[in-house]
Design a protein with these regions (language model features):
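Conserved glycine-rich cofactor-binding loop
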Residues: 10, 17-18
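Rossmann-fold scaffold of SDR-type NAD(P)-dependent oxidoreductases
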Residues: 14, 87-95, 143
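Conserved glycine-rich Rossmann-like NAD(P)H-binding loop of the short-chain dehydrogenase/reductase
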Residues: 33-49
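Substrate-binding pocket helix/loop in short-chain dehydrogenase/reductase
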Residues: 101-102, 106-114
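Active-site helix of classical SDR
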Residues: 125, 162
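Residue(s) in the substrate-gating loop at a strand-loop-helix junction
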Residues: 146
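C-terminal helical subdomain
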Residues: 186, 204-240
Length: 273
């Protein structure tokens, strides 16, 4: 398949109000002249980004406000996105995380994570894949997983579980696609410097995090060149290769010590009630 050409084409970006989604939207508009459909919960941030990109990149931008932990919102958003039949690509980036002891994760929090990271992704993917299969149009999707989906991460147990599902789901679905002009890419970055990793619990792990501009640029490269699975960063790829050669129990144990140390330090720095 040929590379994607984004100029004057409509591309959906979920989770576009901050972090990786916001930066991908900026780069798609400024560097590739893509028209954008920005989806997230925070309308004020989406409208601000829309105004910026329409003015600076001279592209068209639509805003769709939706809470992806709510299936009614998801279905209404998909209807809105597909109604004119012009969608060319989609980046499913929205997600929530939790860093802490799994026993302290509230059930409502877990349900929100599951709905946002898994259920909404599958729901949107089902509808968009069906659209491209039925129409035969050229297009592509980039689904954001994580290196936490490749290797279980203690103290992010639920989060890494959701990302492992996304990784396995997308890798399998790639081989069911019948439209020869449509591709699926699963993107598995390590930690990224974003709003999601700005909390105290992540303070000691900041040195491991990739700058968001680099993560966005590599994600768009993987999307445009239709990679099947892509891990950004040479060190991440090399590290992932060697981690696959070592016993899983050993790797998970080492990660557990690093993450627990960061968590304990963060907890110790919090003011006592």
């Amino acid at each position: 398949m040929s590379k994607l050409q984004f100029k004057n084409k409509w591309v959906l970006v979920t989770g576009a109000s901050s972090g990786l989604g916001e930066e991908m939207a900026r780069q798609l508009a400024n560097d590739h002249q893509a028209n954008l459909i920005l989806l997230a919960r925070r309308k004020d941030k989406l409208e601000k980004l829309k105004d910026e990109l329409e003015k600076e990149a001279n592209v068209s931008v639509k805003v769709v406000v939706a809470d992806l932990s709510n299936l009614d919102d998801v279905d209404q958003a998909i209807d809105e996105i597909l109604k004119d039949g012009q969608l060319y690509g989609a980046i499913l980036n929205a997600g929530v995380t939790y860093f802490g002891r799994h026993s302290e994760l509230e059930w409502d929090q877990f349900q929100t994570m599951l709905q946002t990271n898994v259920i909404s992704v599958v729901r949107i993917t089902n509808r968009l894949v069906a659209h491209f299969e039925d129409t035969g149009h050229e297009g592509a999707m980039l689904i954001v997983s994580s290196m936490a989906g490749l290797f279980p991460v203690p103290f992010q147990s639920a989060y890494s579980g959701t990302k492992a599902f996304i990784l396995s789901f997308t890798r399998a679905l790639v081989h069911e696609i019948r439209n020869p002009s449509f591709s699926l890419t699963v993107y598995a970055p390590g930690g990224i410097v974003t709003e999601m990793t700005a909390g105290e619990n992540f303070h000691d792990l900041q040195g491991w995090l990739m700058p968001v501009k680099q993560a966005a640029k590599e994600g768009i490269y993987a999307f445009q060149t239709r990679k099947s699975t892509y891990v950004p960063g040479v060190l991440n790829r090399v590290g992932g290769f060697f981690m696959n050669l070592l016993p899983r129990k050993f790797i998970t144990g080492k990660m557990s010590k690093v993450y627990e140390r960061a968590l304990v330090k963060a907890e110790g720095s919090k003011p006592k009630p």
